[in-house]
Design a protein with these regions (language model features):
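Conserved beta-strand positions in the Rossmann-like core of class I SAM-dependent methyltransferases
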Residues: 25-28, 47
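Catalytic-site signature of metal-activated, phosphate-bearing donor transferases
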Residues: 57-63, 69, 74, 80-203
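A conserved acidic beta->alpha catalytic loop
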Residues: 16, 28-38, 51, 75
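Short, well-formed alpha-helical segments that are part of the catalytic scaffolds
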Residues: 1-20
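Acidic helix N-cap motif at the loop->helix transition within catalytic regions
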Residues: 8-11, 33-42, 83
Length: 204
């Protein structure tokens, strides 16, 4: 998982998942609090990554350090309650090897809900570390490109300390300045962010 200044909440997350994991990898992107000291209670695999306003870059680095067959990617402000811990354990025992991505239900606590994120939604959270390519048609050697996705019944509780719109807008601006445009997904996400938390300057 990737973290920054999560000392106040990291134990809450790791206590809920640590015994479900075969390895725990922490990538710190510049904490100035005791985040790494808290993490050290759970693992000695703690790494530094210079933050560059790119969550994908940090996530990709964390994935590159993994050794197990599957990678679970929680954030520090997420937890699994006891019922969903049991579901996660059952998933580990029954997971078919052809499954490449497991989606889990994602629910944000009401304090930080808005009309736009009040509903529980599926998010990809568990990933096969090494993808195996295979042919799917009897002629012309067509390779399956679409991953095999399983929608599980596991529900993650998202308990943020605050809204992150200032940070997120900064990343949007950097991405636009770097690429000169947004991908279709980022356009959609930016529009949603504007509706939730934007002000006059953001719409200008």
């Amino acid at each position: 998982m990737i973290v920054k200044n999560e000392a106040a909440i990291l134990s809450r997350c790791l206590d809920s998942v640590c015994d479900l994991m075969d390895e725990i990898i922490i990538v710190d992107t510049g904490s100035t609090d005791d985040t790494k000291a808290v993490a050290a209670k759970y693992t000695d695999r703690i790494y530094d990554f210079a933050w560059n306003n790119d969550f994908s870059a940090a996530r990709n680095f964390s994935f590159s350090l993994a050794n197990m067959d599957y990678i679970y990617a929680p954030d520090a402000d997420e937890i699994l309650d006891e019922e969903n811990r049991k579901r996660f354990l059952l998933l580990k025992e029954a997971l078919l090897p052809e499954i490449e991505i497991v989606q889990m239900k994602y629910r944000t606590v009401s304090e930080f809900n808005t009309v736009l994120n009040a509903r529980t939604e599926y998010r990809p959270k568990l990933f096969k570390r090494v993808r195996e390519f295979e042919g799917i048609d009897p002629i012309h050697e067509t390779i399956r490109l679409t991953p095999v996705v399983f929608d599980s019944d596991i529900e993650i509780l998202h308990m943020p300390q605050s809204m992150h719109h200032k940070r997120d807008f900064s990343i949007f601006v950097d991405a636009f300045n770097r690429e000169g445009t947004f991908s279709a997904k980022l356009r959609s996400m930016y529009a949603k962010e504007l509706l939730k938390t934007g002000d006059e300057k953001d719409f200008a």
